[in-house]
Amino acid sequence: MSEITKEQVVDFIANMTVLELSQFIKELEEKFGVSAAAPAMGMMMAAPAAGEAAPAEEEKTEFDVILTNAGGNKIAVIKVVRALTGLGLKEAKAKVDELPSSIKEAVSKAEAEDAKKQLEESGATCEIK
């Protein structure tokens, strides 16, 4: 059996599509029981100092972009969905046709707002949850 080098693994991962990479990360999380979320928030959200009350509600760090209406120019919306998700034409068209549909899941606020802006510029209506 030949040895696979770290460089070969990195090259293989670098050639994956966004969708393939997302699925790969989820499989790794499940297999090893870990999370790919940044650990810095956990350290910052450590137990409050004596006398301080814990915040009533934690600030949301992961957002979903939900397409609610494709608008009049479905072709432009499909192109944006493909660019954002890395999906093929058939899969992107299915997301645009089957509303509401999740376009991006568990992304940062900035990434969610950027995706929403791109979708709205193409004529779609979407929301961030």
UniProtKB/Swiss-Prot annotation:
UniProt keyword Ribonucleoprotein, yes or no: yes
Keyword line: Ribonucleoprotein, Ribosomal protein
Record bears the keyword Ribonucleoprotein: yes
Biological process terms in GO annotation: translation
Source domain of life: Bacteria
GO cellular component: cytosolic large ribosomal subunit
InterPro entries associated with the record: Ribosomal_bL12, Ribosomal_bL12_C, Ribosomal_bL12_C/ClpS-like, Ribosomal_bL12_oligo, Ribosomal_bL12_oligo_N_sf
GO MF term set: mRNA binding; structural constituent of ribosome
Transmembrane segments: none
Record Pfam families: Ribosomal_L12, Ribosomal_L12_N
Family the entry assigns: Belongs to the bacterial ribosomal protein bL12 family.
Subunit structure, interactors included: Homodimer. Part of the ribosomal stalk of the 50S ribosomal subunit. Forms a multimeric L10(L12)X complex, where L10 forms an elongated spine to which 2 to 4 L12 dimers bind in a sequential fashion. Binds GTP-bound translation factors.
NCBIfam families: L12
Function statement: Forms part of the ribosomal stalk which helps the ribosome interact with GTP-bound translation factors. Is thus essential for accurate translation.
Entry protein name: Large ribosomal subunit protein bL12
Protein encoded by which gene: rplL
